[in-house]
Design a protein with these regions (language model features):
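Short hydrophobic core segments
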Residues: 7-9, 122-135, 167-169, 286-295
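Short glycine-/acidic-enriched loop or helix-start segments at secondary-structure transitions
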Residues: 18, 41, 102, 139-141, ...
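A Rossmann-like FAD-binding core segment of flavoenzymes
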Residues: 88-95, 99-101, 105-118, 122-125, ...
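FAD-site-proximal beta/loop scaffold in flavoenzymes
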Residues: 146-160, 263, 267-272, 278, ...
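Glycine-rich nucleotide phosphate-binding loop and flanking beta-alpha elements
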Residues: 15, 38, 99, 135-137, ...
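Rossmann-like dinucleotide/flavin-binding elements
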Residues: 2-3, 8-34, 154-201, 322-365
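Active-site acidic short loop of glycosyltransferases
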Residues: 3-4, 124-126, 163, 232, ...
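Beta1-alpha1 glycine-rich phosphate/pyrophosphate-binding loop at the start
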Residues: 4, 11-89, 176-205, 311-312
């Protein structure tokens, strides 16, 4: 069985960037990807627009040409296909890495993989880079009914839900954009968020839109509310005491903003930012479909099985200069570095990790 100098787990932008750097150095490299090219971007909603400019998504020095200030999902997919072809990168698709272990003499690593059709194989490499991102592993609520067929952690095409009751759980960009798209496609939308306010990180052009739709009652909103069960035709929710509202300026601003919402236009399920004086209440929200857009995490179990130590935030412990972990020869790049703090690593900064990793590997050869 042949031994590669380097295997990169993940064909996202950070993995592709590392592979390009390796190729420029003449380092034998293979990418193994459990899904398709840039799988996370592929799973974004079809109408998705990036929160950045094209040049900040570029890798390998290949220009990302777009007529727009902010590129679309379709443009990004086309660009990264061009990257893979231009640099003739070796990528094995539909291979999920199950485990990474050292062989007995510790001169190489064994990667056990399995395809969606159940085909298993073992690959050997002297160095491994985990560039697995985090979008493939949603943060689960752990409530009854979370696995029902009408429940998803990923938002797709809003047209499917014309005239349906749809519950969107979350308070960030994904939830806000999904709620708006659903509303404009004729769905009856209820937004459920466990905190008293929307997240501060919502895109600047999305925030006024979602706030105004809530204010006018077009989108029902339940702040300081958590999901306790998903049923076939409804979602059971419970209010959370809004203890932080008194000291949170943003919470106060949003309560004032939504206070005069036109109740006559809002669905019967609408409830906006309950205050601390309101007792906890449990009730049901009608739901033909449910989107749990509550965030994502890297596959920490896979990292741990490879012997990588994680800190209290589930981020891998590594050398900040080289991104090498406590396991010599294993590196981490891109979103997998972030642990629970997924808002710190993006394509814009993760695309540079590969250069530093490959520099460290090249010095050992």
């Amino acid at each position: 069985m042949s031994v590669r100098e380097l295997i990169i787990v993940g064909a996202g932008p950070s993995g592709l960037s590392a592979a390009i750097a390796a190729k420029k150095r003449g380092i034998d490299c293979q990418i193994v990807e459990q899904g398709v090219l840039v799988n996370s971007i592929y799973r974004f909603p079809p109408q998705m627009v990036f929160f950045t400019t094209p040049e900040l998504l570029e890798i390998g020095g290949l220009p990302f040409v777009s007529p727009y200030d902010k590129p679309t999902r379709a443009e990004a997919l086309r660009y990264y296909r061009k990257v893979a072809d231009t640099f003739d990168l070796q990528i094995a698709f539909d291979e999920r890495v199950l485990a990474v272990t050292r062989d007995e003499d510790e001169r190489m690593f064994e990667l056990e993989t399995r395809s969606s059709k159940g085909v298993r194989r073992v690959r050997l490499a002297r160095h491994v880079i985990f560039a697995i991102g985090y979008y493939d592993h949603p943060v689960r609520l752990g409530v009854p009914g979370e696995d029902l067929p009408h429940v998803s952690h990923y938002f797709g095409d809003s047209h499917l839900h014309y005239r349906q009751n749809v519950v969107v759980v979350g308070g960030g960009n994904s939830a806000a954009e999904a709620a708006l798209l659903l509303h404009r496609s004729g769905a009856h939308v209820t937004l459920v968020h466990r905190h008293p306010t929307l997240k501060r990180t919502i895109k600047y052009w999305v925030r006024p839109d979602i706030e105004n739709r809530i204010k006018e009652g077009s989108i029902a909103a339940r702040f300081s509310t958590c999901v306790i069960e998903v049923r076939p035709t409804s979602v059971v929710v419970r209010q959370i005491p809004d203890e932080a509202a008194a000291t949170d300026d943003e919470a106060a601003r949003q309560r004032e903003l939504f206070a005069d919402a036109d109740a006559s236009r809002a669905p019967a399920s609408a409830l906006v930012a309950p205050g601390p004086s309101d007792g906890p209440a449990v009730n049901e929200v009608p739901a033909d479909a449910v989107y749990l857009l509550t965030g994502y995490r890297a596959d920490s179990d896979l990292l741990c099985r490879a012997g990588i130590r994680l800190n209290e935030r589930e981020a891998p412990m590594l050398d900040p200069r080289t991104f090498e972990t406590n396991v010599p020869g294993i590196f981490v790049a891109g979103g997998a570095i972030a642990g629970k703090d997924t808002g710190t690593i993006f394509i814009e900064n993760g695309r540079f990790h590969g250069d530093r990793i490959i520099e460290a590997i090249a010095q050992r050869l």
